Amino acid sequence: MKTVKLIVVGFGTIGKGTLEVLRMKHRDLLEKQGFDVRVAAVCEIDGSIVNDKGINIDSVLKAASSGKLKEHPDWKNAKSLEAIEVVDADIVLELTPGDIKTGEPGISHIKKALECGKHVVTSNKAPIALRFQELTGLAKKKGLKLRYEATVGGAIPIINLYRDNLEVNEVRSIYGILNGTSNYILTKMFEEDVSLQTALKEAQELGIAERDPSYDIDGTDTAVKLVILANSIMGKRISYKDINVRGIQEITTESLELAKKHGYVIKLVGDVNGMEVSPRLIPVNHPLNVSGTLNAIMLDMDIAGTLTLVGHGAGKIQTASSVLADVIDILKDMKEL
């Protein structure tokens, strides 16, 4: 059995979810494929838990739940960049929150990992949206994998699906709902005739919306994901600044009621060909009319025609599903070497 070591950078919601799923699926999935996957380091902003033989996942999750990571026996003062460089590992999971203005600290983490000969899997949208060509080019130069399925659509396997099964197609357009928070709010407003603020407050109480929901409400999150899809699937060379973005702040109960009378709903839609994110009228019987936190993404292709993917676009377990799918993809390539 081949031993493979991971470094987890960023131990927030996605990091914890990834370790929970890894613990759950290790024996059933990974070991059956011939891999003993160990976590060699878990890096947080002020230090790291490091054990070259493999960290006990239960102990790390328990320490995190009680806010006592620093009391873990394997705690070190090594910051993430240092840990990426010195810890013996095969794959770095870059799971930190993204800053769309700078892309940091994700860009530095990804570059350091690739420069040190480590494959990378990331859920961090900002580096992939801002430095797609640079980072994928560096990975190719180093003969390494950079995987980022978890940056778009939660558990929806859109990037890997295209790469593994649909690459014979020319994708003519990508169009869809890419943000579960805004979709939940619009669904709530439409179905229960409540204001945006009322729907937003409930979303925050349920943990669907962040305390500062601006990235979701103003369309930034959708635009970032749109850029990633455009570059990775359609071969475009665009950045966030190329997208015209308008969010849902001005949507009222009156506008939704008017749409309803004419057989429409209003959804926040990302449109690659239009280079735009904006609220749009969608017929009630249209495939994009999905409710709650669901995402729906339509690909129009020259051979396969139109394909619509629907699924949960957020959540720690759903995103962890995509993170570990990318890990397994890398493991399969390592197995063939």
Regions found by a protein language model. Give the residues of each.
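ATP-dependent carboxylate/acyl-activation modules
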Residues: 286-337
